[in-house]
């Protein structure tokens, strides 16, 4: 027979496992401090990038503010088929079924018209 302490521990572990399987919550990968450090690095990169662009524009010459600026618009063309997937349990499927059906109705006719 198991002792009362072992039984209590197993019961707590089982309850925690059941709760974890039922939740749809967000599990943070990074700590709050790590996220702040990453944001600071991104800001620093952005400042560094804007300074280098500013220096290049000064080398070329002053830009007339009345002159319209042409911005490059890039279009990414896929050379291979792309497949996007997601996993859902039955409870999530019941919850989001109507939304998914609507998205599929919009996506499938548009892909048939394109072919």
Curated annotation (Swiss-Prot):
Plays an important role in the regulation of interdigestive gastrointestinal motility and indirectly causes rhythmic contraction of duodenal and colonic smooth muscle. One of its GO terms (molecular function) is motilin receptor binding. The gene is MLN. InterPro entries: Motilin_assoc, Motilin_ghrelin, Promotilin. GO terms for cellular component: extracellular region. Keywords: Cleavage on pair of basic residues, Hormone, Secreted, Signal. It is found in: Secreted. Belongs to the motilin family. This is Promotilin. Its main location: secreted. Residues 1-25 form the signal peptide. It comes from the Eukaryota. Residues 43-73 are annotated as: Disordered.
């Amino acid at each position: 027979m198991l002792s009362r302490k072992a039984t209590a521990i197993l019961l707590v572990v089982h309850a925690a496992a059941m709760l974890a399987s039922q939740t749809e919550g967000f599990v943070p990968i990074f700590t709050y401090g790590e996220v702040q450090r990453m944001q600071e690095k991104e800001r620093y990169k952005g400042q560094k990038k804007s300074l280098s662009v500013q220096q290049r524009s000064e080398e070329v010459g002053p830009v007339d503010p009345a002159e319209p600026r042409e911005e490059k618009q890039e279009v990414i063309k896929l050379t291979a088929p792309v497949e996007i997937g997601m996993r859902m349990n039955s409870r999530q499927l019941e919850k989001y079924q109507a939304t998914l059906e609507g998205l599929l109705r919009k996506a499938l006719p548009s892909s048939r018209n394109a072919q």
